[in-house]
Amino acid sequence: HPTLRRQRQMCIRDRFFQEIIIFGFLLFILFTSNPFANIFPIPSEGTGLNPILQDPALAIHPPILYLGYVGTSIIFSSALGAIISGSINKSWASHIKRWVLISWVFLSIGILLGSIWAYYELGWGGFWFWDPVENVSLMPWLCLTALLHTVFTLEKRGTFQSWAIILSITTFSLSMSGTFLVRSGILNSIHTFANDPSRGVFILSLIHISEPTRQIR
């Protein structure tokens, strides 16, 4: 069936670009965060988890937030496939909208849980403190919200093709940029619990995968 064939072709293209992203992060783990690397000198006792992070909400807030970030990589991969194949149309919008919605839901829940935790954590300024790291998580959410409306419009009316692609790529780029800013130590934030400039530079190099945005006019 032609529709099933198109869906299969889109999935193959999406998977190709997604595998490139996964390979990049595997290199990141291997060269900067190897879990099997020896520690020398051997510490006599670990420092333990920061007391601020010893909260049940922190068992679900970061994973849910990062599930939203991971979803933006799938959207990004699909956008690249649509650019190369020239299939930025209603079928592509129908194909990608569920990933946009899933990512938006996870990112929304993650931000909400973080806000609730910040409310009862002493000295965090209420539900929203406009901390740099909080703002970093808000930017992809705003782009995802705009993309959600754009994709539904593209599916129904066949318009806003360029906006759908631009927002798809920008959302992923903002997620990567936010990760770089947090891990590199550039931002001075109350969220800064672990940073390493060398790891931040590696993440920054992965952001250049977004170069296809220059081809969009």
Q: PLM features: residue spans?
A:
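Membrane-interfacial loop-to-helix junctions in multi-pass inner-membrane proteins
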Residues: 5, 9, 13-23, 84-105, ...
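Helical transmembrane-bundle signal
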Residues: 19-29, 72-82, 104-114, 144-147, ...
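Juxtamembrane interface elements at the cytosolic ends of transmembrane helices
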Residues: 36-37, 42-43, 67-86, 144-149, ...
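Single conserved hydrophobic/aromatic residue that forms the stacking wall/gate
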Residues: 1-8, 12, 208, 212-217
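Acidic, glycine-enriched active-site microenvironments
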Residues: 16-28, 32, 36, 40-47, ...
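Conserved active-site neighborhood of enzyme catalytic/cofactor-binding cores
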Residues: 112-117, 125-127, 132-173, 177
